[in-house]
Amino acid sequence: MDHSSSKLVSQARLDSEANWLFWGSFIALVATAFGFIVRTQVINEWGIQFNLSETQKGELFGVGLWPFALSIVLFSLVVDRVGYGKAMVFAFGCHTASAIITILAQGYWGLYIGTFIVALGNGTVEAVVNPVVATMFPKDKTKWLNILHAGWPGGLVLGGMLALMMGSVDWRLKVALIFLPTAVYGLMLFGRRFPVQERVQAGVPYKVMLQEAGILGVLIVVALIVSEVGRVFSWPLFLQLSLGSVLVVGYTVYVRAWGRMMFFFLLLLMIPLATTELGTDSWITALMAPEMSQLGIHSGWVLVYTSLIMMILRFFSGPFVHKLSPLGLLAVSSLVAAVGLVALSKSTGVMILLAATLYGFGKTFFWPTMLGVVAEQFPKGGALTLNAIAAVGTLSVGVVGAAFLGYVQDRTIDQELRLKDPVLYTRILAQEKVSVFGKYRPLDQDKLELISLAKQRIVEEIQAGAKKDALMVVAILPITMLGGYSILILYFRGRGGYQAAQLLDQTTKG
């Protein structure tokens, strides 16, 4: 075999390996979505069976998210040394163990632990696939990250349809659906050779990666992690502040850099972005249940429908990115999402499907395009900056977003029921509870079952109004994002337009 033939064979092998890695990563994201969508389908069954309040259900959504951020940050710090393949073995173990624990759960804490473990696996998957794909496609990162993240809505569609078609079967069988994509990505990725991350290839030192994120970036991540873990384990505020201070001061002493201000700004924007997309996704089934039931359609189909829109559009993201630029695409998406959420909160009947379509278009490009902007602007940050933006987004939903939506509903139900029927209010409200947002009194599910059908209808009407209020509140967030992206667009326009930063090989210098 001559040299040219040998080179062609070698390239073919590389292309084949890249295909297996990319689509294996895609299926791994499908697995993360399966766990999420099934939770939205069975959360109301959990509420009835285990007498959960709306805020407790919100906390279960939250614990499906914040440990994700914990694992994605920790693996980002060590994954280049540990190895991407070993990290995926850990993710596989988490997905398998979490399903078993959840299926065997006997109450709130069993569900909580099972959901916590699946979130660790999900974070590990993202810690691996984002830098791997950014490295494989260095000249078109935003496009390929969008295609990769079509796996998320794709998993929502497939997992959601399977769960809905299973009908009223035991929720444990629906939870077991995650075994399907987990087995597939395990077979596709185990034993594969992962590429060396572009920062490492270019010889950019580990400390420089930490300096790109900087003190300000780590301050946000640490504050969100410590506040949520402190809430879960009932740590006093003094302990939370002390632990957070030790972590941030230790990081400061080592890196001695504030970090990139644009990265800090993008971290702040990621908080409303993630709450708009994931926070609303978490509740979309329950939020739209009253209206969809009047049409004779299970509300879970709304999330499946909007996810189908996302999946299709992400596969064809290239023209949108090239026409509008990543920041332009994010600005337009923010406006469309805001209009869609307002429409969802006001629409009734068939019009709700049109509103859901608008919302689906709006949220489609948020997450992967934000990752693309970070990958293109901060390549020296390697796996850390790329995954820290995802961590902050996920933490903000786990700590703030999902629990906040539940709190809005519980507080609205409390206030409206007290005004409409004070006697009923005293009969069916549970003891006062405390969340991160303050005190509230949830409905007692056991007492609710004992009242008359007429009284139950009163409660259902109030609950429906509370769900609409939650959607209207979320609509404020993409408006905030639109302002932020407009500022960045003007900044780049003053510098000649948006351009991806080029990573020079540090090993060839001086």
Predicted regions and their residues:
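Conserved MFS/SLC helix-loop-helix module at the cytosolic interface between two early adjacent transmembrane helices
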Residues: 70-109
